Amino acid sequence: MKHLFILLFLLTTNAFAQGPFGDYAVVKDKDGYVNIRAKENVKSKIVDTLPNNTLVYGFFDKEFNPTNWIEVDKGYVHQSRLKKIFDFRAIEGKVQGNSLVFDDKDVKVTITKQKFDKTKHKITKKEHDGWTELIIDGKAIYGIDIYGGNDDSLPEDHYKSITVTMKGKNVPIPKSAYDDLYQIFYFSSSVYYDKEAEVLYILAHNSENASAYEVCWQIVKGEYKGRVIGYPL
């Protein structure tokens, strides 16, 4: 089953992305933090730091990033101070009814999607120079970039719920963590667990072509910390 999920993951990510996706990684340094440099150089000015287990997104592949540096909000961090989430323990998943369930002795994650019902949402639009943005329930959304003004331009589906249990305790995931995400690709979801730090990562690649995106949610010691959205090149 694990190999099936990996195969489906590779097939879907290659199929819907216009370019390669980056990787999610976290800070793992013996000092407990990593320096953010102003430029891609160890002698460059230190502008800030990131503590261990800070989630970042970047391009590690030498074909697309020939340096050993990953760009973050305020500058650059060295790749050697980061660990990809794929290197943590993967939790196997399986379909149960309308849900995708990842379950082992420490963690259980249930991801449920549902069809988009336009009668239950407020649909508006925002005009830009040469294109129209779709706004749903007052929020900019992920999964559809250009709104054509008809039902064919509306999303097909979205997340209904994401529930997480860690060591038998429920972890509340706010609706705001996923209610702006659309065009869900079930079999591109994966879950990884850093047992030592008690950190859970839920990763999904959704939509296709120019609207493709990925998201990683992070739960630290039974508390939802946030998400990072990534885009292909």
Language-model features: where?
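Acidic, glycine-rich flexible loop segments
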Residues: 173-215, 220
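SH3/SH3-like beta-barrel superfamily modules
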Residues: 19-25, 46-82
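Short N-terminal segments immediately surrounding and downstream of signal-peptide cleavage
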Residues: 18-37
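Surface-exposed beta-loop interaction hotspot
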Residues: 76-143
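Sec-dependent N-terminal signal peptides
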Residues: 3-13
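Mature extracytoplasmic domains of secretory-pathway proteins
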Residues: 136-185
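Short alpha-helix capping/helix-loop boundary micro-motifs
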Residues: 40-45
